[in-house]
């Protein structure tokens, strides 16, 4: 699944991606992930408020979609920039069935955040347990992690739409995990290795995208 299809199916914007490992370009897998994470982190910044900490809820409909994977990369990226970042997970730092969580109005009602400037909160799979509406509304951002190589079902969409309703005015975006490299390059630009042949292929693909967008605009679609 790519950005265009994901946005058409879900009705929400895809803010970023994380690429799957490439056998062909194995030496560059880590670099590709770091580039993708830089682009995602940069896309998140405009939604940060002035109040601290900035709270970002990391969500998914199913287990194994990559919530912790994305959250850990985000944390490491910002920490390398000198920011204090907290990472809280339903697996260790809080109990999603506890009274303090279920009745919480904001993050500090059920977790200690210390002096963190940014707090990433990884919640339980939403097909198992929902997140209380006040926690979605009080955050700066809600990110739904979805695997690009897994079929998005009717149940996934129903859960996603419910989260959108619960979020109120808090922005809700998709982040696609395990994307193909060509899909990733729609967000990052050309990924390494930067050979002459790959540069030529990339320019060719961009010309194809431009032509397709022009045709859509002319037809009014």
Predicted features along the sequence, with ranges:
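Switch II (G3) loop of P-loop NTPases
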Residues: 86-138
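A short, gly/pro- and small-residue-rich
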Residues: 133-144, 163
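Conserved Switch II/interswitch segment of TRAFAC-class P-loop GTPases
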Residues: 124-128, 139-157
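Structural motif
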Residues: 57, 118-122, 143-145
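Short, high-confidence coil segments that cap the C-terminus of an alpha-helix
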Residues: 51-53, 114-117, 139, 169
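A generic short-segment signal for beta-strand/edge and adjacent turn/coil regions
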Residues: 26, 110-114, 141-145
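Short boundary/hinge segments that flank catalytic cores
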Residues: 1-84, 90-96, 101, 150-221
């Amino acid at each position: 699944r790519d950005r265009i299809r994901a946005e058409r199916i879900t009705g929400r914007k895809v803010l970023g991606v994380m690429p799957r490992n490439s056998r062909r370009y194995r030496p560059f897998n880590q670099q590709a992930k770091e580039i993708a994470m830089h682009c995602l982190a940069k896309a998140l910044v405009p939604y940060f408020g002035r109040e601290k900490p900035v709270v970002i809820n990391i969500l998914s409909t199913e287990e194994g979609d990559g919530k912790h994977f994305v959250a850990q990369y985000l944390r490491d990226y910002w920490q390398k920039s000198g920011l204090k970042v907290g990472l809280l997970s339903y697996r260790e730092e809080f109990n999603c069935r506890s009274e303090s969580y279920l009745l919480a109005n904001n993050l500090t009602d059920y977790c200690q955040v210390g002096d963190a400037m940014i707090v990433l909160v990884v919640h339980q799979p939403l097909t198992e347990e929902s997140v209380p509406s006040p926690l979605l509304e009080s955050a700066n951002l809600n990110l739904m992690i979805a695997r690009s190589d897994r079929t998005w079902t009717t149940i996934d969409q129903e859960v996603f739409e419910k989260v959108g309703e619960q979020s109120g005015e808090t922005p809700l975006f998709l982040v696609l995990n395990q994307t193909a490299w060509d899909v990733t390059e729609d967000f990052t630009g050309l990924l390494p290795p930067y050979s002459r042949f790959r540069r030529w292929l990339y320019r060719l693909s961009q010309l194809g995208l431009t032509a397709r967008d022009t045709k859509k605009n002319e037809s009014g679609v």
